[in-house]
């Protein structure tokens, strides 16, 4: 079940007894409204295409072709791919370290979770919003939004990704250590 937790950004440094969220909800309507007020897109789509376990990129993209085309037209994204992470992926540890550092992008970060889950953490103004995304969740993080992503120490997810940069995922790291002070996926 998807979950949103909102913390003040200074909480981690000042809370000896741990972090206490200002808001915590599993209600999709509350999640969508709370994120929308902060300029973040969140939708839940059916993920019912009955893909075979370990489906390759071509199979995934074909199964979701209509939805992918709609998002491409709506956002002007001309590149799309699918990423699959598993506990035995050879690059899981370096990728996790890279994704866990607070960063921004010059373009929107748009992800649809075909299976599994991941934790997007957004640093917006004086708040930190932790969004557990699961199968069927679509997140749109606007360009320039400070954030990090945790796929967990034993990742298991597949997500469709949209880009308007032909180079794909390109991060500008902020140099902040804030991501080390907030809860992770596991």
UniProtKB/Swiss-Prot annotation:
HAMAP family: Salvage_MtnD (MF_01682)
Keywords: Amino-acid biosynthesis, Dioxygenase, Iron, Metal-binding, Methionine biosynthesis, Nickel, Oxidoreductase
A Pfam family of this chain: ARD
Protein name as it appears in the record: Acireductone dioxygenase
Binding site for Fe(2+): 103, 105, 109, 147
Cofactor(s) for this UniProt protein: Fe(2+); Ni(2+)
UniProt site (May play a role in transmitting local conformational changes): 108
Protein's pathway: Amino-acid biosynthesis; L-methionine biosynthesis via salvage pathway; L-methionine from S-methyl-5-thio-alpha-D-ribose 1-phosphate: step 5/6
Site (May play a role in metal incorporation in vivo): 102
InterPro entries listed in its UniProt record: ARD (IPR004313), ARD_bac (IPR023956), RmlC-like_jellyroll (IPR014710), RmlC_Cupin_sf (IPR011051)
Species whose genome carries this gene: Synechococcus sp. (strain CC9605)
Biological role stated in the UniProt entry: Catalyzes 2 different reactions between oxygen and the acireductone 1,2-dihydroxy-3-keto-5-methylthiopentene (DHK-MTPene) depending upon the metal bound in the active site. Fe-containing acireductone dioxygenase (Fe-ARD) produces formate and 2-keto-4-methylthiobutyrate (KMTB), the alpha-ketoacid precursor of methionine in the methionine recycle pathway. Ni-containing acireductone dioxygenase (Ni-ARD) produces methylthiopropionate, carbon monoxide and formate, and does not lie on the methionine recycle pathway.
Catalytic activity, reaction form: 1,2-dihydroxy-5-(methylsulfanyl)pent-1-en-3-one + O2 = 3-(methylsulfanyl)propanoate + CO + formate + 2 H(+); 1,2-dihydroxy-5-(methylsulfanyl)pent-1-en-3-one + O2 = 4-methylsulfanyl-2-oxobutanoate + formate + 2 H(+)
Subunit structure: Monomer.
Binding locations of Ni(2+): 103, 105, 109, 147
Top EC class for this record: oxidoreductase
Its EC number(s): 1.13.11.54, 1.13.11.53
One GO BP annotation of this record: L-methionine salvage from S-adenosylmethionine
Gene Ontology molecular functions: acireductone dioxygenase (Ni2+-requiring) activity; acireductone dioxygenase [iron(II)-requiring] activity; iron ion binding; nickel cation binding
Matches recorded under SUPFAM superfamilies: RmlC-like cupins (SSF51182)
Annotated site residues (Important to generate the dianion) in this chain: 111
Family, as annotated: Belongs to the acireductone dioxygenase (ARD) family.
Cofactor: binding details: Binds 1 Fe(2+) cation per monomer.
């Amino acid at each position: 079940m998807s979950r949103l937790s909102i913390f003040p950004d200074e909480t981690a440094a000042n809370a000896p007894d741990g972090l206490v969220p200002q808001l915590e909800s599993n209600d999709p309507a509350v999640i969508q409204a709370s994120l929308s007020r902060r300029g973040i897109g969140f939708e839940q789509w059916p993920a019912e295409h009955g893909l075979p376990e370990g489906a390759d990129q071509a199979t995934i993209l074909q199964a979701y072709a209509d939805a992918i085309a709609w998002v491409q037209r709506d956002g002007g994204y001309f590149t799309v791919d699918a990423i699959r992470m598993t506990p035995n992926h050879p690059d899981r540890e370096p990728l996790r370290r890279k994704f866990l550092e607070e960063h921004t992008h010059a373009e929107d970060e748009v992800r649809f979770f075909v299976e599994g889950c991941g934790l997007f953490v957004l640093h917006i103004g004086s708040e930190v919003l932790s969004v557990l995304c699961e199968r069927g969740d679509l997140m749109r993080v606007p360009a320039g939004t400070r954030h990090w992503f945790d796929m967990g120490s034993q990742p298991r997810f597949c997500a469709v990704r949209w880009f308007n940069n032909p180079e794909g995922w390109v991060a500008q790291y902020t140099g902040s250590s804030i991501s080390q002070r907030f809860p992770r996926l596991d």
